[in-house]
Amino acid sequence: MSSAKPINVYSIPELNQALDEALPSVFARLNYERSYALLDAKLYIGYSIAVVAGLSFFLDKKFERDQIVTYQKLLVGAYFVLSLLFWYFSRFIEKGTVYVGKRRGTKEEIYVKTKFEKNEPLYLVELVQKKKGENSKKELKAKLEVNKVFNESGYLQNDAYFKWFSEQHNVLDTKKNE
């Protein structure tokens, strides 16, 4: 089975997008359900920043400057703190995670981070497996040559992609806890 739409296999951004978009279906076949907790947290922080900015604008339009200086100072401080929190969350907590999944029926979570380096057709994948309630954490870094999962016409071969991830997942399962 291949993807419905061909891509330019010489374009790293297109390769990255196509491979990242296929991750949910691959992990669904591995019995994982997508978790949106990181995305939800990032959205809450972002919406909070927008609310603070909107409230500041509203106060500026409705009241005289003398009446709202203290409130504006508080809102600017809140905006700064929320922006700093957003930056910290993006930089250190989320750090390039493109997929988070929870295995059905267990407390196991998997975090998938992907990237391309130096515009080479090597898809760098980092898998982090955690079990809630236990302090077990397993990590695996792997490289996928994209010509193994795309044909010459630019179609993603989903079965080959799934097989590669299945092999990596098996390696991760056999690793000892770190």
Swiss-Prot record:
Record carries keyword Transmembrane: yes
Pfam families reported in the protein's UniProt record: SPC25
Transmembrane region(s): 38-58, 68-88
Keyword GTP-binding: no
Swiss-Prot/TrEMBL keywords: Endoplasmic reticulum, Membrane, Transmembrane, Transmembrane helix
Topological domain ranges for the Lumenal compartment: 59-67
General function of this protein: Component of the signal peptidase complex (SPC) which catalyzes the cleavage of N-terminal signal sequences from nascent proteins as they are translocated into the lumen of the endoplasmic reticulum. Enhances the enzymatic activity of SPC and facilitates the interactions between different components of the translocation site.
Subunit structure: Component of the signal peptidase complex (SPC) composed of a catalytic subunit SEC11 and three accessory subunits SPC1, SPC2 and SPC3. The complex induces a local thinning of the ER membrane which is used to measure the length of the signal peptide (SP) h-region of protein substrates. This ensures the selectivity of the complex towards h-regions shorter than 18-20 amino acids. SPC associates with the translocon complex. Interacts with SBH1 and SEB2/SBH2.
The protein's name in its UniProt record: Signal peptidase complex subunit 2
